[in-house]
Regions:
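Signature aromatic-anchored transmembrane alpha helix within multi-pass, membrane-resident enzymes
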Residues: 59-60, 178-198
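Juxtamembrane boundary at the C-terminal end of a transmembrane helix
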Residues: 198-207
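Alpha-helical transmembrane segments and terminal signal-anchor/GPI-anchor hydrophobic tails
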Residues: 45-157
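Hydrophobic/aromatic-rich transmembrane helices and adjacent perimembrane loops
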Residues: 153-171
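Membrane-interface transmembrane helices that cradle and orient dolichyl/undecaprenyl
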Residues: 1, 6-19
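Membrane-interface junctions at the ends of membrane-embedded or membrane-associated helices
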Residues: 15-19, 171-185
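Membrane-interface alpha helices of multi-pass inner-membrane proteins
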Residues: 9-10, 20-44
Length: 207
């Protein structure tokens, strides 16, 4: 429900009503405190797709992955006086090896397509698609981070941004490929996502 409320801010972000969007995110945070994590990205994801701000977000993600041990020590120190003070020790105690790399790759598909087909996005000049691309970049960055830290804790955060992929991916298919290619790709994706769904069920012992 918290993720749905944050996603409902989309029309407000497009109309640049950031105050109202902030209030809704704060409301979502009363349902789940992690919704506050989405607040800075209200401002970071403004502007054209793949702009400097979103690229600057990816830089610290890469640095964290390269220096993961130092990052976890700093994170543990920062969370010491909060309700999340045991997060780092918990994911180490649970032997949490991070988000499965296949899951990271699957959720990164819309982001990768947006980079490959950036000229189509630039030509369309649609603020909604620009927003969706930037949210998708954030989602992918956090998923990459979760692959090297915690799938249980960090791996849950992308839900606030990955919902935009449900707008972005269909747009990419219909604007970047020919009609015949779209049909073939749609069938292939249905098969692959079905496989991915059952793979997820099996991974969690539900199948």
């Amino acid at each position: 429900l918290a993720a749905a409320l944050v996603f409902a801010c989309c029309p407000l972000l497009l109309r640049k009503r950031y105050g109202q969007a902030t209030l809704i995110i704060l409301l979502a945070a009363t349902l789940h405190a992690s919704a506050l994590f989405a607040l800075p990205f209200v401002f970071l994801t403004r502007g054209k797709a793949w702009n400097r701000k979103t690229l600057l977000f990816l830089l610290p993600t890469v640095l964290v992955v390269l220096f993961i041990d130092r990052f976890t020590n700093i994170l543990e120190l920062l969370l010491q006086e909060t309700q999340y003070k045991n997060v780092v020790s918990d994911w180490k105690g649970f032997e949490d090896n991070g988000t499965n790399l296949l899951r990271v790759l699957v959720y990164a598909v819309p982001t990768l397509l947006s980079l490959i087909g950036l000229r189509f996005i630039r030509a369309e000049n649609d603020p909604l698609i620009d927003l969706c691309v930037n949210m998708s970049i954030v989602s992918t960055g956090i998923y990459i981070l979760s692959a090297f830290t915690s799938g249980i804790f960090v791996g849950r955060l992308p839900i606030y941004f990955s919902l935009y992929n449900y707008i972005l991916l269909p747009w990419e298919l219909h604007h970047m490929f020919s009609k015949r290619s779209v049909r073939i790709l749609t069938v292939m994706m249905l098969i692959f996502y079905l496989f991915f769904y059952f793979y997820g069920l099996k991974t969690f012992g539900l199948l």
